[in-house]
């Protein structure tokens, strides 16, 4: 049960850092592809 209790401490920063990075990258690629700006 130690790994389950320590899982959120690793999972939360991972989601908090990786998900915005993927969102920013996909957004920048979408803007470059569509050439809106």
UniProtKB/Swiss-Prot annotation:
One of its GO terms (cellular component) is photosystem I. It is a single-pass membrane protein. InterPro entries: PSI_PsaI, PSI_PsaI_sf. Pfam families: PSI_8 (PF00796). One of its GO terms (biological process) is photosynthesis. It is found in: Plastid, Chloroplast thylakoid membrane. The chain crosses the membrane at residues 10-30. Keywords: Chloroplast, Membrane, Photosynthesis, Photosystem I, Plastid, Thylakoid, Transmembrane, Transmembrane helix. NCBIfam families: PS_I_psaI. PANTHER family: PHOTOSYSTEM I REACTION CENTER SUBUNIT VIII, PTHR35775. May help in the organization of the PsaL subunit. This is Photosystem I reaction center subunit VIII.
């Amino acid at each position: 049960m130690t790994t389950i209790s320590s899982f959120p401490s690793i999972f939360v920063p991972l989601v908090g850092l990786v998900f915005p990075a993927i969102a920013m990258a996909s957004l920048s690629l979408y803007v470059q592809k569509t050439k809106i700006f």
